[in-house]
Amino acid sequence: MQQDQRKKSSTEADFFTEYGDASRYKIQEVIGKGSYGVVCSAIDVHTGEKVAIKKIHDIFEHISDAARILREIKLLRLLRHPDIVEIKHIMLPPSRRDFKDIYVVFELMESDLHQVIKANDDLTKEHYQFFLYQLLRALKYIHTANVYHRDLKPKNILANSNCKLKICDFGLARVAFNDTPTTIFWTDYVATRWYRAPELCGSFFSKYTPAIDIWSIGCIFAEVLTGKPLFPGKNVVHQLDLMTDLLGTPSMDTISRVRNDKARRYLSSMRKKEPILFSQKFPSADPLALDLLQKLLAFDPKDRPTAEEALAHPYFKGLAKVEREPSCQPITKMEFEFERRRVTKEDIRELIFREILEYHPQLLKDYINGTERTTFLYPSAVDQFRKQFAHLEENGGNGPVIPMDRKHTSLPRSTIVHSTPIPAKEQPRIGPSRDKPSDEPYSNPREFDRFSGNAPRTSQAPQRVPTARPGRVVGPVLPYENGATKDSYDARRLAMNSGYPPQQQIPQAYGYYQIPGKSACSELSQAERYTLHQQAYTCANSATVTDVALDMRAPPFHLSGGPKSDSSERLAAETNLYTRSLNGLAATAAGVAASAHRKVGVVPYGMSRMY
């Protein structure tokens, strides 16, 4: 039991690699494999729903494969319909620039129509009718969006035990625009031959229509009725022979409209064949079903009905109402601009990343506003909160909150000790007057420079650490600006010590400096004490220091508001504070001197409040 559990955990780790949403899904079993990757069944621990997760690996190895994946996820986002498989989620990759795999979360379907046909020999006429109804209803929605599926076959139609069907696999689909060159539109057509319309087998026409999908639906419906493929051709010529064996040779009018000279000559030279009665080919089928099937399998595409016209056929009386079957708005050219120009792998990667963000609304908003991050390997605490809020937004405010994972980049900031002295830097004279608290809180942390009368300067801070690379642990060092820190990802600001309420005594730092010949600080003479006092006062008020300075005027916390006063009042108040705390400052100077003697600089971090 434990061995199975460990094996399952190992499988999950191998399946998800570094993707952060992995904890949301509990892998059950592998339900499919192919050249694209692997499909696993899983449970969404947030909703309890069963899903199928399709891992597509190395998607950018071949640009044609990447374009096919982009096309499919884009179309499935745009074509939302009960009879079309739904993408529920796409996991956010660990890096925007370097990801190679994607994880697409679908609703879980138990089987496909190919398996249903093979395993069930007891399907009823009601099954046949309901199956065809769902397929035509989905096709109506697809075609009203000006989309041709181009690869309809039983394996691309998912099925559940409750007879629910859903069309999937839009990798070969295309959006038809009036100005799309036909030669480009069909150059990569490699759909399964058995379900391919005759005009595609022989390149009969230069302009193709949605009738190619109608033909495929007819072939699928005939296979449902008989349990075996209708036209299992071994090659294109054999395929055309099988078609004409059932339907008869096409009329001279149809042949005359064939644009391809070779195909036209072949059809003209074909011996005359009479069509076979469908009632003879399908003896146990409903006559209305056969009447509709014969229309779906018309050799000439202009004789085939549209999906909407087929739904209005008497075969669906009492089941379908054309006016209530949904239609889709035509898809705009902008969505598929990449199909009309030469694109690189980097272009496709960016477009796929943009599609992934459609399932992460908050990050999509940042992306559109130009404030997105380029890597998501090590999220900070703020990123974790954003993830929780995005989860609640995506789930309509329902469902449990994602637990906060403790990441090394969100650990508390520790004291940074430099092994070499920090170069002398100019110390800012910041901090508002401490005579009385202000009744008006200010929102801009830069305003205290105006209150104090000082020009903006850069406060002393630890030297900036290079940006962390994936896999390298580097503590967080925020950029400093005028005593405030700013998160590069968030518009909110962190203000350091922008205000300080009146108090009796300022924080003190204690140290001991031993003068040669003296055992301790307590043995200093009055003159030596006075000298140290003067040094401390000079250090506290000077603009520069020679080695290391601890600005004890900066408290370890601050309030959101600060008093407003002129510089003379502020100076008087600070002078009084320094006079009362002269002994403490002397000890501070002694500590500074000791630190300088040891050549070790200690940079204290005060707590700050986010707003």
Curated annotation (Swiss-Prot):
Give residue numbers for the modification (Phosphotyrosine): Y189
Q: Name one GO biological process term.
A: intracellular signal transduction
Give the span(s) annotated as Disordered. Answer: 394-481
Gene Ontology MF term list: ATP binding; MAP kinase activity; protein serine kinase activity; protein serine/threonine kinase activity
Motif range (TXY): 187-189
PTM sites of type Phosphothreonine: T187
For whether the record's keyword set contains Nucleotide-binding, the answer is yes
SUPFAM superfamilies attached to this UniProt entry: Protein kinase-like (PK-like)
Q: Which family does it belong to?
A: Belongs to the protein kinase superfamily. CMGC Ser/Thr protein kinase family. MAP kinase subfamily.
Record note on domains: The TXY motif contains the threonine and tyrosine residues whose phosphorylation activates the MAP kinases.
The identity of this protein, by name, is: Mitogen-activated protein kinase 10
